[in-house]
């Protein structure tokens, strides 16, 4: 008997050793399941690599690790991501964005009417659902699911090109507030793109996984997700490897686009006060918007950033009206004492036959100015934070980890506002732009049976949970 046990033990050790050597020296298998973050403003795709335990967020053909959640329809084709972004100002009525706000959601006619005024494209109400009307060779009606499917198809193609093999299975994230119909509509969009969804995971849970919180001893986790257009705050209660969403709040009309708009309005006023005209050419407005976005990004790292945009002045715009200052609102557009904006208007080429000339508008924007223009918006971030603490019956001192998600949480002043409120630094160990897609990719690796095996995050459904929105 003892001899048999010895032989059995030796066999087990041999198998374990063989498995270890196989992991060390055999070629690593290619990931078979992708993880997708289908965001409101940007979306991305990632994979978990067996053996190394690393996550790779897959870039597009130009090296972008996320693509704008935009789809444009023209007479000849459908453009997705950055190609769509380039058409946004020249073809606004046929460029659909924010489709995630509409997917699977039931609207009353009054609710939808309140939403559609924000968009240049046409939104229709059909049996309680939203649809989009676009005109290419003819007028066609497209659903939010179809728009989502075009984005998911682009992400699928990016993954297939990177991995060098077809991809059929995915894990996808959705907001914790999504009901069953919204989740099923998201799955339907993936099916249209040729993807089978193995699991739907809540975005806050995915972010917590990216930070490794499913493997450490924490109890209460607050996830602050501030992206391009929405703010979502979620209170997670972690019990072992399980996550329960205790409370949700947010503002679905607050994000990086709003911060950009404040700076854009300010620059418009600077141009108007000097020249008495506002940029009206679509390509110049597009360049100005791009410049504002670049300034915002640069100000996360530097104390000042430069704006330089070439503008066209029509002959009848060359004289500044005497009452120019009264044409634009003053609130939030004028910096306080101590702000200096270095404006340079350089005359360019003039065409006497067409009555047009060009000027180079240059200005230096300080981080202090940017913060002043947006301070009231930054403070609004605290409102849903206070609400989830109230609904969760917790004091802010009881929160174990404050996790930041979304590109707008890079803004130094926003991090400072959060730090001052909680009295401690938020967890910034993960790239906030990639937190959700990283967590989804980890879960995709788990569902695909990748090794080294990670601890899976189990979500406890909370059917009574309602999100409080502050708009």
Curated annotation (Swiss-Prot):
Task: Kindly give the SUPFAM superfamilies that the UniProt entry links to this protein.
Answer: Actin-like ATPase domain
The molecular function terms of the Gene Ontology recorded here are: ATP binding; ATP hydrolysis activity; ATP-dependent protein folding chaperone; heat shock protein binding; protein folding chaperone
Task: Tell me which InterPro entries the record gives.
Answer: ATPase_NBD, Heat_shock_70_CS, Hsp_70_fam, HSPA13
In the UniProt record, does the keyword Protein transport occur?
no
The GO biological-process annotations, alphabetized, read as: chaperone cofactor-dependent protein refolding; protein refolding
Q: Where is the signal peptide?
A: 1-22
Family matches, as Gene3D superfamilies: 3.30.420.40, Actin, Chain A, domain 4
A Gene Ontology term for the protein's cellular component: cytosol
Statement: the UniProt record of this protein carries the keyword Glycoprotein: yes
Q: Which terms are listed as keywords in the entry?
A: ATP-binding, Endoplasmic reticulum, Glycoprotein, Microsome, Nucleotide-binding, Signal
Q: Where is the segment annotated Disordered? A: 316-339
| Compartments where located | Microsome; Endoplasmic reticulum
**Glycan-carrying positions:** 184
Which Pfam family, an example, fits this chain? HSP70
| Task of the protein | Has peptide-independent ATPase activity.
Q: Which family is annotated?
A: Belongs to the heat shock protein 70 family.
Q: How does it assemble?
A: Binds UBQLN2.
Kindly provide the name given to this protein in its UniProt entry: Heat shock 70 kDa protein 13
Source organism of this protein record: Rattus norvegicus
């Amino acid at each position: 008997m003892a001899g048999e046990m010895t032989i059995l033990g030796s066999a087990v050790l041999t198998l374990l050793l063989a498995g270890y050597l196989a992991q060390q020296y055999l070629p690593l298998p290619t990931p078979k399941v992708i993880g997708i973050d289908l965001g409101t403003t940007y979306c991305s795709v990632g994979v978990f690599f067996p053996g190394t335990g690393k996550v790779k967020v897959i870039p597009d053909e130009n090296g972008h690790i996320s693509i704008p959640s935009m789809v444009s329809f023209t007479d000849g084709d459908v453009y997705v991501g950055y190609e769509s972004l380039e058409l946004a100002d020249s073809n606004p009525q046929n460029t659909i964005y924010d489709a995630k706000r509409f997917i699977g959601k039931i609207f009353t006619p009054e609710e939808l009417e309140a939403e559609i005024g924000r968009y240049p494209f046409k939104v229709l109400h059909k049996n309680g659902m939203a649809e989009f009307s676009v005109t290419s060779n003819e007028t066609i009606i497209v659903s939010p699911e179809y728009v989502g499917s075009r984005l998911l198809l682009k992400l699928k193609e990016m993954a297939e090109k990177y991995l060098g093999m077809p991809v059929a299975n995915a894990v996808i994230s959705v907001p914790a507030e999504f009901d069953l119909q919204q989740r099923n509509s998201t799955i339907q969009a993936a099916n249209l793109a040729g993807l089978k969804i193995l699991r739907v995971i809540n975005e806050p849970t995915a972010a917590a996984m990216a930070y490794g919180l499913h493997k450490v001893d924490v109890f209460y986790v607050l996830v602050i997700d501030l992206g391009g257009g929405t703010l979502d705050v979620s209170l997670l209660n972690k019990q072992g490897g399980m996550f329960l969403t205790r409370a949700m709040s947010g503002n679905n009309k607050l994000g990086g686009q709003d911060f950009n708009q404040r700076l854009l309005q300010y620059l418009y006023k600077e141009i108007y006060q000097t020249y008495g005209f506002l940029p009206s050419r679509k390509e110049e407005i597009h360049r100005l918007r791009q410049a504002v976005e670049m300034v915002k990004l640069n100000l996360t790292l530097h104390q000042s950033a430069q704006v330089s945009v070439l503008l066209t002045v029509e002959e009848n715009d060359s004289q500044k009206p005497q009452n120019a200052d009264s044409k634009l609102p003053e609130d939030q557009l004028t910096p306080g004492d101590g702000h200096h904006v270095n404006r340079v208007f350089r005359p360019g080429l003039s065409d006497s036959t067409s009555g047009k000339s060009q000027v180079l508008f240059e200005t230096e924007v300080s981080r202090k100015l940017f913060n002043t223009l947006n301070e009231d918006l930054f403070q609004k971030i605290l409102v849903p934070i206070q609400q989830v603490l109230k609904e969760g019956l917790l004091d802010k001192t009881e929160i174990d980890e404050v996790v930041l998600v979304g590109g707008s949480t890079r803004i130094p002043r926003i991090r400072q506002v959060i730090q001052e409120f909680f009295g401690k630094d938020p967890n910034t160990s993960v790239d906030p732009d990639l937190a959700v897609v990283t967590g989804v990719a980890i879960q995709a690796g788990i569902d695909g049976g990748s090794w080294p095996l990670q601890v899976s995050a189990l979500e406890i459904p909370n059917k009574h949970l309602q999100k409080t929105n502050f708009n």
